[in-house]
């Protein structure tokens, strides 16, 4: 039977000093016999997805205490990718993921916590905490802050999100008044941005990974039903903590739940729902922490057989996350995948012995539980607010239409190939990633001359100045994990291509990455990156690039001899931008760049370099 980790600081005469300090935090005599559970919060007033989390850690803590354990809360950092977008602030976003993972490890191990509840929400916070959960391998449950409601305005027939505001702002034909109305309407409530962007994609994936409760990815931040998720997380973490330490049930540990099958289920869901390409980057990093052999080739294999069953903004203007919830949420999609024999539902979760049993209860197509139907009718109130759990609106009915609704069955899939694809070729020997869910059918095969830029700033300037022509492949290089450093998101370049009418007439190729809000022929994560000697650094203006998504290939039309000659010349010059960029790179970012791997490895730090 494993011993409670916390006994290191709470048991024995020699720990009198530690107990004295624990007492100063409010612990009493009988508390020293209880499990100590860390409540890992990420409240900040900088981020709309986290602005409402301040009191929610204590909500969870009170439930933990009612269930007979001790709760101790701490906070991590949280970067808002949308606010950090389009300037040097974005250099810090991806590195913050590893800082978050480290900070959770530091706090939990330093204080010998027995288990943890992770309260996350936005882009790098959920994956950072997932990395920590797999690294620590102690009982853990995730509960997110929830998605914001979609925006509404009389100026548009469809609901709005952040990307709509960005696109309209770059549209020269839009008046200042129209831009201001979109800006005021796009993000009406607290919560993670309302489309299937990175934050919501990752929170949905925690459900299929088995580390969160049903509805974690789709119940609105403003809805009263989400309060129940926080309360249940506090209760359930105590149950599984006792199950591990007192019954020796290792099946409740993150690495037991996060098996190879669970990671394959996660990417299967991601492909089926057309999630953000960032999820690939994060799943690869999380799998490494879990010591699971899961790589781009697994993702490539699954992308060829999993259909797209759900289409949500930014891939369509018709649906947002609130509509996915009305259609049965993530368990609605999982039910269709299970019926299509595309899921390994034998894996365990933190709330059910198997995923199959959970699907049987939570899939609206097969359950007879009226409470489940009531749960998935939770909808938006349309009232701007930063207050969690402030409304209890219900949709009048569920969206159970699997032929033409938000979630489709396999027979009526949006497409028989899923929403993500991995491409290989002489420009990306180790692969690159495209969100096919956002690519128009007319440009699934695309060939055009390269338009070289060596920073996101240069790409934006060229697009806005009208220098980018229809038919070109805009290359943004030296923006990878090392080269940026920090692997910036390219939401502004792709949004501006749209606003200039080039969304279906140009491609964008980068060793950087894309926001979950990106759509169009946007190919990122090119590996190896330019700064690591990748062939993307050898391409010149006018070189012809051929992209063939159906055949999963991407190549620059140059001979091997020409590429070899260019490589030899580049080796002499060094793998860096041709001209010095006006970019301030701090010591902290330089440290990240020194250890960072390319995107095909999840852009994690290669700590083996420290062994030399």
Swiss-Prot record:
Binding locations of Mg(2+): 81, 123-124, 489
Ranges that cross the membrane: none
Family matches, as InterPro entries: Dihydro-acid_dehy_C, DihydroxyA_deHydtase, DiOHA_6PGluconate_deHydtase_CS, ILV_EDD_C, ILV_EDD_N, IlvD/EDD_N
The record's free-text note on cofactor binding: Binds 1 [2Fe-2S] cluster per subunit. This cluster acts as a Lewis acid cofactor.
Residues the record lists as binding [2Fe-2S] cluster: 122, 193
Reactions catalysed according to its record: (2R)-2,3-dihydroxy-3-methylbutanoate = 3-methyl-2-oxobutanoate + H2O; (2R,3R)-2,3-dihydroxy-3-methylpentanoate = (S)-3-methyl-2-oxopentanoate + H2O
One cellular-component annotation, GO: cytosol
N6-carboxylysine: residues bearing it: 124
Enzyme class at the top of the EC tree: lyase
Key word Iron present: yes
Cofactor: [2Fe-2S] cluster; Mg(2+)
UniProt KW Lyase keyword: yes
Keywords annotated in UniProt: 2Fe-2S, Amino-acid biosynthesis, Branched-chain amino acid biosynthesis, Iron, Iron-sulfur, Lyase, Magnesium, Metal-binding
Homology family: Belongs to the IlvD/Edd family.
Quaternary context: Homodimer.
Chain's role: Functions in the biosynthesis of branched-chain amino acids. Catalyzes the dehydration of (2R,3R)-2,3-dihydroxy-3-methylpentanoate (2,3-dihydroxy-3-methylvalerate) into 2-oxo-3-methylpentanoate (2-oxo-3-methylvalerate) and of (2R)-2,3-dihydroxy-3-methylbutanoate (2,3-dihydroxyisovalerate) into 2-oxo-3-methylbutanoate (2-oxoisovalerate), the penultimate precursor to L-isoleucine and L-valine, respectively.
Protein name: Dihydroxy-acid dehydratase
Originating gene: ilvD
């Amino acid at each position: 039977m494993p011993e409670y980790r916390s006994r290191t600081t709470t048991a024995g005469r020699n720990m009198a000093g530690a107990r004295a300090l624990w007492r100063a935090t409010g612990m009493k005599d009988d508390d020293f016999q209880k499990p100590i559970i860390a409540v890992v919060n990420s409240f900040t007033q900088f981020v709309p997805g986290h602005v409402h989390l301040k009191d929610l850690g204590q909500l969870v803590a009170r439930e933990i205490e009612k269930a007979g354990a001790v709760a101790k809360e701490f906070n991590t950092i949280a970067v808002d990718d949308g606010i950090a977008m389009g300037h040097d602030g974005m250099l810090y976003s991806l590195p913050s993921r590893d800082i978050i993972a480290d900070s959770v490890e530091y706090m939990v191990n330093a204080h010998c916590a027995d288990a943890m509840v992770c309260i996350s929400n936005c882009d790098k916070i959920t994956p950072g905490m997932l990395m920590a959960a797999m690294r620590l391998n102690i009982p853990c449950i995730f509960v997110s802050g929830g998605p914001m409601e979609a925006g509404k305005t009389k100026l548009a027939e469809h609901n709005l999100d952040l990307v709509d505001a960005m696109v309209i702002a770059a549209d020269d034909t839009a008046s200042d008044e129209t831009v201001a109305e979109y800006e005021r309407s796009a993000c009406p409530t607290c919560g993670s941005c309302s489309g299937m962007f990175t934050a919501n994609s990752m929170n949905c994936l925690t459900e299929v990974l088995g580390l969160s409760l049903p509805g974690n990815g789709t119940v609105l931040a403003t809805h009263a039903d989400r309060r129940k998720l926080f309360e249940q997380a506090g209760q359930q973490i105590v149950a599984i903590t006792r199950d591990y330490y007192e019954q020796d049930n290792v099946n409740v540990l993150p690495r037991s739940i996060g098996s190879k099958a669970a990671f394959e289920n996660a990417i299967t869901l991601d492909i089926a729902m057309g999630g953000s390409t960032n999820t690939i980057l994060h799943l690869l990093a999380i799998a490494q922490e879990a010591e699971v052999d899961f790589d781009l080739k697994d993702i490539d294999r699954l992308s060829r057989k999993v259909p797209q069953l759900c289409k949500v903004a930014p891939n369509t203007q018709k649906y947002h996350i609130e509509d996915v919830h009305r259609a049965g949420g993530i368990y609605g999609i999982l039910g269709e995948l299970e019926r299509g024999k595309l899921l390994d539902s034998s894996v365990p979760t933190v709330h059910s012995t198997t995923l199959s049993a959970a699907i049987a209860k939570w899939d609206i197509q097969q359950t007879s539980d009226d409470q489940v139907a009531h749960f998935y009718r939770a909808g938006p109130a349309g009232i701007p607010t930063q207050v969690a759990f402030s409304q209890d609106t219900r949709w009048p009915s569920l969206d159970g239409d699997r032929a033409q609704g938000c979630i489709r069955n396999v027979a009526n899939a949006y497409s028989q190939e899923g929403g993500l694809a991995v491409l290989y070729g002489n420009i990306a020997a180790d692969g690159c990633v495209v969100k096919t869910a956002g690519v128009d059918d007319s440009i699934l095969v695309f060939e055009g001359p390269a338009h070289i830029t060596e920073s996101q700033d240069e790409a934006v300037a060229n697009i806005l100045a009208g220098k980018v022509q229809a038919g070109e492949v805009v290359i943004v290089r030296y923006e990878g994990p090392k080269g940026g450093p920090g692997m910036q998101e390219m939401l502004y370049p792709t949004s501006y291509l749209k606003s200039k009418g080039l969304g279906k007439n140009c491609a964008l190729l980068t060793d950087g990455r894309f926001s979950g809000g990106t759509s169009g022929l946007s190919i990122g994560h090119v590996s190896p990156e330019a700064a690591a000697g990748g062939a993307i650094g050898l391409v010149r203006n006018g070189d012809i690039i051929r992209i063939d998504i159906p055949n999963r290939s991407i190549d620059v039309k140059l001979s091997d001899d020409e590429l070899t000659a260019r490589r030899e010349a580049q080796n002499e010059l060094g793998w860096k931008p041709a001209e010095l960029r006006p970019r301030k790179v701090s010591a902290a970012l330089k440290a990240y760049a020194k250890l960072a791997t390319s995107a095909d490895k999840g852009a994690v730090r290669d700590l083996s370099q420290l062994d030399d």
